[in-house]
């Protein structure tokens, strides 16, 4: 609508892996295709959306090159599941994360990596957030985990307008696509802007808060539901929407708001050696005057449990560790 061309590719992106997009409609009698999003305004940019071949390495490499040559376009690659991007790790290491530092070559490529610990097993749960955060330095790219539709929208809109161009890694939702609690009003889209940190949404009284839980992504909604179930009015839950560049001022502002709190928590679904914590332990802890405890799954060689029963037990243990210490 604002004149930015959008090019999107990936495996099953026209429909969406989770049957959530339906960006291209197919006539099964004539084989004609029609995309409603191409007909919103007479002055809109062009939308090109392609179902790509099953080669992450080849496709991300091509889209990276396209984004370099067309930096004014929003060039997006979406994984079916976030961990499928590991097939293109060479491109991510050699080009996406480091080309500006090595050669002064800038890219505006967007990677959408569906992520979420929802009981789907080791190969469909983790986008390997820790790997992207390990590559972050010198303001080389943005890594974000939007937790609401409006946050997702404002993140992409900001990226389209941002100069100089930088890659954007979005740890995108799965379960949240259909979770009623993860919704936004029309006003949330038409007003405001992307917020790197979203403060507590429950209306807790800051002076009465004894525990502040920082979280990023899907786990926020589990924590919110558990807090309501317990009738807890002394815990504030803060959503960190942008992981890099680390929003230091916004995090400190939340800590200052709850100055009476004595229990500061970083909560994550991922094992202790994965997810956001290794990055936060290195970059966040040294700049805050608080002791922060980690609540996570135990360190693991595998990203996630292989059985639904074990997954459920781990999720229950996380809630107890957060609210009972």
Residue ranges of each PLM-predicted region?
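Non-catalytic terminal/interface segments that mediate subunit docking, oligomerization
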Residues: 1-72, 77-100, 186-238
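A short helix-to-beta-strand connector/capping loop
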Residues: 45, 139-140, 233, 290
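Hydrophobic/aromatic beta-strand patches that form the interior of the parallel beta-sheet core
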Residues: 9, 75, 110-112, 144, ...
